[in-house]
Amino acid sequence: QVRGINFMIPHSFNPKSPYDRDYPPYFYNDGHEPRFPLYKVWADYTSRLSLMLTGGKHVCPVAILFSGNARRVGEYVTPEDMTTVLQDALYDCDWLPFEAFVSDASIEGNKLSLHEENYKVLIVPPTEVIPYETLAKVKEFFDAGGTVVGYGRLPSKSATVGKSSSEIVNLRNAIWGTNPEISNKACKTSTASGRSYFLPEKPDVKTITAAIKEDASIPPVIEVLEGETNNWLHVLHRVKDGKDVFFICNQDH
């Protein structure tokens, strides 16, 4: 639930229990499930969390651009690994579809707004092919003072009819510069103090922290002032009725 789930639906009920070997049932299991007496404890706990984590306003600093179709037309890396390392570094993030980014998101200075969400960092996925209008809006955000992060590879081909790959390369170079090197320091800055970064395909917590927190001066959702978390601490932040609600979870299983 620390990753954003706020409505739990139990499943795996099986009328053939306990004799179905293909899909063995859980929960009651005709009285054969020894953990069932504790199910109410778990269900009550998740119900309380669902109530606390529903409504209000989600506070999230990072948006990851995402496309389910980009991998069909060229090299593409899905955002799961980047999502995990961001959360390990105590940065919450949302996946933002290309289409929603272009049509619904607005740029307000160095922030990207979508409905009630406000993002300070925009991450462009490692993709070979990208729609022209998507990358053009990334450049607009960078020019307005936003922080843009690429990793692994930068786009080089157009997914838009009538727009050439050279036009994509021109936009890419305007954001990250020509032949940027992988570094936790900014590749390029805009006149409005926008910053662009090019990180490795699988960055670690140290790299994320060095680039986003230390170089771009964008703090994580919370900071651990004393002790070691071994990168297992994840956090979700909402504002409800004018009060901050933080759900802090130890993911070390």
Which residues are covered by each model-predicted region?
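Carbohydrate-binding surfaces of carbohydrate-active enzymes
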Residues: 1-253
